Amino acid sequence: MPAAICPGWAEEKHLWKQGFSSIAGLDEAGRGCLAGPVVAGAVIMPPRLKGDWVAMVRDSKVLTPEKREYLYCHIVSMAISFGVGVVDNTQIDCLGIAPATRLAMKQAVEHLDCRPDFLLVDYLKLPDIPLPQKGIVDGDALCFSIACASIIAKVSRDRLMCELEATYPGYHLAKHKGYGTALHMECISQKGISPIHRRTFAPLKSMFDVI
């Protein structure tokens, strides 16, 4: 298996040279899940970061849960500002996943303590946010700020899903985090669809056994 790509600072350095000083990375977690919210992270990182952890930052999807938690602590402690947006399954079913993801990202930006002057976004364009921005394909693998945002989003969502396990026992949410794993599908077949499941997502839209 090839080594994961190390995200770089090329985008940020280019923007700093143009005069932008408050550059926020944005990414989401939970877009493809069958249960729970979609969560977005926004983060403004300072230049010239130091520490062994900096070289460990990657797209959250290629990191172990333990390493994500470790990096999350360093990222939020060193960030100029960070914000999290959460859009629940009811809103996802009403809006659709793409608009819901954009809404979560908008919330994350609004929760920043300082207003960014440029957004670096993983893949998406955000027309509802009136700020200069750039959507980058595979941005979470290529861009340091977006990779940091991906870790914030993933850890924030995973923690929320672990909390929801107490409210919805028997679904093992802490294990699969709402993704469509074999374990999750077995739980659904035994218990039916819960109030936090996304009813418009296949194969759940054909099930109506709501607890």
Swiss-Prot record:
An example Gene Ontology CC term for this record: cytoplasm
Which residues are listed for a divalent metal cation binding in this entry?
A: D27, E28, D122
* Entry-linked SUPFAM superfamilies: Ribonuclease H-like
The protein's location, in the record's own words, is: Cytoplasm
Cofactor binding remark: Manganese or magnesium. Binds 1 divalent metal ion per monomer in the absence of substrate. May bind a second metal ion after substrate binding.
Per its UniProt record, the required cofactor names are: Mn(2+); Mg(2+)
Keyword line: Cytoplasm, Endonuclease, Hydrolase, Manganese, Metal-binding, Nuclease
Molecular-function GO terms, alphabetical: manganese ion binding; RNA binding; RNA-DNA hybrid ribonuclease activity
Q: What class of enzyme is it?
A: hydrolase
| CDD domains per UniProt | RNase_HII_bacteria_HII_like
Q: What residue stretches are annotated with the RNase H type-2 domain?
A: 21-211
Which EC number(s) does UniProt give? 3.1.26.4
Question: Which residue pairs form cystines in this protein?
Answer: none
Q: Which reaction does it catalyse?
A: Endonucleolytic cleavage to 5'-phosphomonoester
Where does the protein principally reside? cytoplasm
Record GO biological process: DNA replication, removal of RNA primer; mismatch repair
Function of the molecule: Endonuclease that specifically degrades the RNA of RNA-DNA hybrids.
Family classification: Belongs to the RNase HII family.
What name does the UniProt record give this protein?
Ribonuclease HII
Gene encoding it?
A: rnhB
